[in-house]
Amino acid sequence: MGLLNHLIYDGVESRDFGVFISGEGVFDAPARRGEMISIPGRNGSLFMDEGVFENITVEYPAFIGTGYEELFRTKIGDLRSALSSRGNYKRLTDTYHPDEFRLGVFREGLEVDPQHITRAGGFTLKFDCKPQRFLISGEDPVIFTANGSITNPTLFASSPMIKVTGNGTVAIGDDGKYRFVVSNNTGTIWIDSEIMEAYLPAGELYPWTDESETVLTQEIGIELELLDGTQYPENMLSYIEFYNSIMPKIEPGEQPIRMSPTITRLEIIPRWWRL
């Protein structure tokens, strides 16, 4: 028998419960978001593209074989509890795609269709996932202390995490398409293009009203539970001026990086992705 495939969801490994998967439902692609508009007197329809993609339901046909009814029921119950206890988007990986991961939510219950109730059960694990397949390599930081370049190996512009130490101008891309200026910074500011926020490293907190906030950090999908009455100061956005009010992205191919000498360190976690 060949190697049995399994998944890992927020640290929960299906194989620890005797559960293994097949890959029929993991290779589909998400739909592009937009609106089809019919124009009188014109053949066909006009597609108003929004430039983004919809969420996708990822389904894993799964099975469990234990040999004993009591053990079977226990394992299913434990797996159901482990998956259902995770809230919000969590990291989802599987052995079919060892070089990438998704962000998914386990929202649906786990219904077992017993093939032989005392020995095995077949069922489907469903996750509501963001459209991107994030590359593991996109988590590796690229560090600059002077001008340089970065190469996006995919066909899609990424929304990076950028950590800036110092003050001055940073320009990414040809002709500095994605440019911003940092002022009054006395340490390191994190700029998160995915959630369009800027803040200090975790732990440096200031007054806020929400109980918690989800922040995509280097390990995309980590949920930072903030204490009641805390926040990042002004979200730090007031310290940064973005050219044309656009958060930085890294477009496909080699992209130049330019920065002022007063920027002492620039760390980019690129978050490469594909569909």
Task: Please state what every model-predicted region is.
Residues 14-20, 101-108, 179-185:
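Short amphipathic beta-strand/extended segments with alternating polar/hydrophobic composition
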Residues 52-56, 84-86, 117-121, 154-156, ...:
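Solvent-exposed loop and beta-edge segments used for protein-protein assembly and interaction
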